[in-house]
Amino acid sequence: YLLSEESRVEQLKKSIPKLVKELGESKVTAGSEVKYYQGTEGLKQMIWNVVNQKDEFLGLGYQDWNATVGKNYADKLRQKMLDNKLRSREILNEVDDSFAFTDLGKGYSQVYEHRAIDPKILLINHDTYIYGDVFAYYYHYQGEYFGVEIHNKEIARTERQMFEVLWKIAK
């Protein structure tokens, strides 16, 4: 048995250089891009990117935008959504049906719809956004603020499908 395992390990060792070469030669799908954002200003830019497009965006929500970019900036973006009739659907662990988080009040519900999912099914501890051909992570916790946008049609499509499954489960 030991000789068999040693032989297998030797074969794996020999295959590593070939694998490394192949990985180095592989190309990112044409048009794919990854963007990294840091700090409050970076997250402001990310949210701007989310609301500065025409189609509905989807997401998982950890906290409302006020927590990271401030209520004034967040309400400007929410107003932009209303003005442009940009719809959004979000899944959260807890929902605020009073809309107390925004000065726009329940008028914001014209473009924003949310549902709750039990944290035992899915514990949400960061935000995600899906829009166009973009899937984005937005993280803020204990002073750490960063985000990543993945610009890739297939990844966005898959994430959108997973969101729709969760949307049906959420209430």
Residue ranges and their predicted role:
Residues 38-151, 155:
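Hydrophobic protein-protein interaction segments
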Residues 32-36, 61, 171:
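Short, small/polar-rich loop/turn modules that mediate ligand/substrate recognition or access, typified
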Residues 1-33:
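Short, charged amphipathic alpha-helical surface segments
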